[in-house]
Amino acid sequence: KSIKRRDKWRFLRIGARWDRSVVPIYEAAARGKCVPLLKTLLTSHCRNECAYCAFRASRKCPRMTWEPRKLAEITKRLWEERKIMGLFLSSSVFKDSDFVTERQLETVRALRNMGYTGYIHLRLMPDVNRHYFREAIELADRVGVNLEAPNKEVFSELCPDKGGFEESVRKRLEWVVDEVRKTKTETTKPKFGFAGAGVDTQMIVGAAEDNDWQHIQTTEWLYKKLGLKRV
């Protein structure tokens, strides 16, 4: 059955709210300015049971997916019409993390090949293979991996089947930071991409037996040790 595009936006933007927004085009704060971004999930099909998520696997709800090429075309058109300045692309985990990441990269690769030089914020998946990070960093202006929690105990409560906190998310975030640092030594880079806007992450606050001090400690480590731009 054919699904109208506006209905697809309506459902995919629900999932995108877990990345700080409830609408597909929203005003992001950047260096004292408001930047309109197109924000969406690539798919709402998910295999995981994260306690806070509207699209957890066991929940009965409509499931939608964008084809990478189509999403790239829509983004390019909105950018040319000056309705947006960038794309924030995240996703639920369908099949496995590598599969989803390949589809994300297919989307942003197509967008860059269309001549798009606007902002791209790419949210990478937990457990994803490190060899995807280099291309993601080259294509996107900001990249990140969601920690979801300040420590492994809270993570296990929130994300019981998402892998281990240290291995699946924290190590991936450290890998991203390491790969971004490697690109800083390169002298010939375009004016877009190459994670020029840095690395970010997010944590869910108050959905488990967490406390403010845990989040403060972890946030301090993220900013001072890893050098993240936003938590």
What are the language-model segments listed below?
Residues L37, C50, L89, V145, ...:
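Conserved, mostly hydrophobic/aromatic
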Residues A72, K95-V231:
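Conserved AdoMet/S-adenosylmethionine-binding subsite of the radical SAM
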Residues I74-S92:
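Short Fe-S-cluster ligation motifs
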Residues C53, G86-L89, V143-V145, V231:
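Hydrophobic residues within beta-strands of alpha/beta enzymes
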Residues T40-R69:
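Canonical Radical SAM [4Fe-4S] cluster-binding loop centered on the CxxxCxxC motif
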Residues K1-N48:
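Flexible, acidic/Gly-rich N-terminal and inter-domain linker regions that tether
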Residues F55-C61, L87-S97, I120:
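Short acidic, glycine/Ser/Thr-rich loop/turn "cap" segments at secondary-structure junctions
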Residues N48-Y52, K83, E148:
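Residues forming anionic-ligand binding surfaces in small-molecule and nucleic-acid pockets
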